[in-house]
């Protein structure tokens, strides 16, 4: 019998995937910022490139450690840290007084979205049923696109305020508004995460099975919760067995082509 998606499951997935919205917003907003920041800070081409790409550079390192760190202290704690870093990056970027402070502030945001891109899909997969997992995880991708759209729309309106001659949105200030407005969805994200439970699967790995069962019952109901509990227990057992598998297995003939295709698609997505 097909399991229907509950409103609670959708709400949790939507809240967690707001990190994707902030990623898209952060990545898109910089396109409007640089036409003002460049002349104000007298940036050369290399510095301009670093301001734009610094967040992606920092995200690379966050991706390497976010998964392992969340295994130790929990998915929810890392997601809360992600929301906090987004808010901190927005405020410090808006008040940047030099190339260096803007560069470092952007890197803080990069740490946030690097961790979010790893953890949000993982968390959503861990709280959803097999029937609805694909649909719920895809909310993350939808929110990334919506974030880009919101960023371009925000840039448009701030540019219109600048053109209108408003003193508050002059050339020296308008880019600060562009960057600072991200603080509001970041704080909303932070607040909503307190209504999100810890990952049941992570709780199981920490020998907190009773808490995990309670969460699953609240999300899916008692009947489906039993199915999910069995699935989690089986998955954890299989994970323990697979720990002995070396990373060199990725280069085995059976997986090599799949890995190359996956990496190529990721590179092409970023290049375009």
List each model region and its residues.
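Transmembrane-helix signature of 12-pass secondary carriers
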Residues: 1-272
């Amino acid at each position: 019998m097909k399991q229907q998606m509950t409103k609670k499951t959708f709400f949790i997935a939507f809240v967690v995937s707001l990190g994707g919205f902030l990623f898209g917003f952060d990545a898109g907003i910089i396109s409007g910022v640089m036409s003002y920041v460049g002349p104000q800070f007298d940036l050369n081409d290399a510095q301009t490139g670093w301001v734009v790409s610094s967040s992606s550079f920092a995200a690379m390192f966050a991706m390497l450690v976010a998964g392992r760190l969340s295994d130790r202290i929990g998915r929810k704690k890392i997601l809360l840290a992600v929301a906090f870093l987004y808010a901190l990056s927005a405020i410090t970027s808006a008040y940047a007084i030099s190339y260096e402070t803007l560069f470092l502030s952007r890197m803080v945001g990069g740490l946030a979205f690097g961790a979010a891109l790893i953890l949000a899909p993982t968390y959503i997969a861990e709280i959803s049923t097999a029937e609805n997992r694909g649909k719920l995880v895809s909310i993350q991708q939808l929110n990334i696109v919506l974030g880009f759209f919101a960023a371009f729309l925000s840039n448009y309106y701030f540019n219109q305020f600048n053109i209108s001659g408003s003193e508050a949105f002059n050339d020296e200030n308008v880019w600060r508004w562009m960057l600072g407005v991200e603080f509001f969805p970041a704080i909303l994200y932070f607040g909503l995460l307190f209504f999100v439970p810890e990952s049941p699967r992570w709780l199981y790995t920490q020998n907190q099975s009773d808490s995990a069962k309670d969460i699953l019952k609240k999300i899916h109901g008692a009947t489906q919760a039993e199915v999910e509990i069995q699935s989690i227990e089986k998955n954890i057992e299989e994970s323990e067995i697979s720990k002995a598998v070396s990373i060199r297995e990725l280069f085995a003939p059976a997986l090599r082509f799949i890995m190359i295709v996956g990496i190529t698609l990721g590179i092409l997505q970023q290049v375009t």
